[in-house]
A protein has these predicted regions:
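Extended, non-globular alpha-helical segments
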Residues: 12-27, 32, 108, 114, ...
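Leloir-type glycosyltransferase catalytic cores
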Residues: 84-141
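Short acidic loop-to-helix transition motifs that present clustered carboxylates
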Residues: 30-36, 53-54
């Protein structure tokens, strides 16, 4: 989630080091043209990514591709649709979906756009607007 104001994985470097040792290629989809993103996702056997719009690219994956979504534990009713949208997309696409639950860390400074359109109460309470820490033992793919 490079460049994002929230849902960053605080220990991302530790995770990417583990994944590289397991043979994963680490990419930032935002740095690729859409046709390159399609090719990358279409040729992947496994995708591991934090919750965010880049996961929409899983629609280009072959059936049976394993999708590992890193995300917080959403607990509020208003977070229900957020919680399951990529799981539903994976299931509709015939993919194998797995969730890696992350602990949350408060964000000190929310983006101006978030502060303009989202109530302070939601920004402060919702896991959607926090950063994440993943237990390294959970990266056992």
């Amino acid at each position: 989630r490079e460049g994002s104001a929230y849902r960053k994985v605080v220990n991302e470097n530790d995770i990417t080091n583990i994944l590289r040792k397991k043979g994963f290629k680490i990419i930032n989809p935002q740095l690729y043209k859409i046709d390159e993103q399609i090719e990358i996702f279409a040729n992947a056997d496994k995708i591991i990514a934090p919750h965010g719009s880049n996961l929409a690219n899983i629609i280009f994956c072959d059936p049976e591709t394993k999708i590992f979504e890193i995300g917080p534990n959403y607990i509020f009713d208003f977070e229900k649709n957020i919680k399951t949208k990529y799981e539903k997309l994976a299931n509709l696409s015939g993919l194998k979906y797995f969730k890696i639950n992350a602990d949350t860390v408060n964000v000190k400074n929310h983006s101006k756009i978030a502060m303009k359109y989202v109530s302070k109460k939601i920004l402060d309470k919702s896991s959607h607007f926090k950063n994440m820490i993943v237990k390294l033992s959970d990266i056992d793919l």
